[in-house]
Amino acid sequence: EGSGGSGSSGNFTTASNIHMSSVTNTSIAGTGGTGTGTGTGTGTGTGTGTGTGTGTGTGTGNGSASSNYRGGGVAIQPVTLTESLLNK
């Protein structure tokens, strides 16, 4: 904004008043977002086992056997001894 002056001898004088408004830049720092995460996991396992065993046993037994044999005998015939047989 300025105003000019007047001059009578051909001299021109100019006076100027310049007003500038100051500009202030304000920056706002941004904030980061938040995040959440979930995770699942599974696990498997195997196992083996072996075992051995022995066993013994005893046993008793009773047995009997009998035999009855009746065989026919030879019949003994009576012999008559005579004098003629004895003298031979």
Swiss-Prot record:
Sequence repeats lie at residues 30-31, 33-34, 35-36, 37-38, 39-40, 41-42, 43-44, 45-46, 47-48, 49-50, 51-52, 53-54, 55-56, 57-58, 59-60, 61-62. One of its GO terms (biological process) is rhythmic process. Residues 30-62 have a biased composition (Gly residues). The keyword RNA-binding does not apply. Disulfide bonds: none annotated. Residues 30-62 are annotated as: 16 X 2 AA tandem repeats of G-[TN]. Forms a heterodimer with timeless (TIM); the complex then translocates into the nucleus. This is Period circadian protein. The gene is per.
